[in-house]
A protein has these predicted regions:
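Non-catalytic cap/lid and distal C-terminal segments of serine-dependent acyl enzymes
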Residues: 1-207
């Protein structure tokens, strides 16, 4: 996934109903896509993959724009931002980056419809015809970590990914998972999972 700012969430921000910038989804899928096609020879067979917040973006973009991507992969992705307690973390992060915590998708209760419209957990039905790869660790120290560490974020994302995977299986999404147990929210795992998902992504590009 291309960059979406330090905390942009691959979304066109609500901004209390006013819209306007930042508009990451529009930028990536309209402006940047057209530039790549026009000036760099990018084709119309596309796949999308991302890690952490980018994993959210990969699934959200694929679900919200059906037919644009032939496969989607998420590595330790935030795949259910409405999961218990997580909206508060997102809003706290927005404040930490100097943003209005309600500008992204609004209040998770009052504007729940907007949150659900971006949350892959609620969009799995729109991925029925898109092969999906999900991978995540469980937060315990794995082969790339010093002994004894525990990663609370990765443990939370493990819960989210298991919930989304179960929902995908119920609606018939063509799903591949690598829930590899011990592992933290760090680059060595994501690099390994990119290699593991590459055959699926390449099949999507080849059609």
């Amino acid at each position: 996934m291309p960059e979406a700012g330090p905390f942009g969430w691959y979304s066109d921000w609500w901004n209390h109903g006013a819209g306007g910038p930042p508009a990451w989804e529009t930028f990536h899928l309209r402006e940047l896509r057209r530039l790549l096609e026009r000036d760099y020879g990018a084709g119309h067979r596309r796949v999308v993959a991302g890690l952490s917040m980018g994993g959210f973006g990969a699934l959200s973009y694929a679900a919200r724009n059906r037919g644009m991507f032939r496969a989607a992969a998420s590595y330790s992705g935030v795949v259910h931002p409405l999961h218990d307690g997580f909206p508060e973390g997102i809003m706290a992060g927005l404040v930490e980056f100097g943003e209005d915590p309600l500008a992204l998708w609004g209040d998770p209760v009052a504007q729940r419809r907007i949150w659900e419209a971006h949350d892959p957990y609620y969009l799995v039905g729109r991925l029925r015809h898109t092969p999906v790869f999900l991978s995540v660790g469980d937060g315990r120290a794995g082969p790339f970590d010093p002994p004894g560490v525990f990663d609370e974020l990765e443990a939370e994302l493990s819960l989210q990914n298991h919930l989304v995977a179960a929902r995908m299986e119920r609606v018939g999404v063509q799903l591949t998972t690598d829930f590899y147990g011990p592992g933290t929210h760090t680059w060595p795992y994501w690099e390994r999972e990119l290699h593991r998902s590459l055959p699926m992504l390449l099949r999507g590009l080849r059609g």
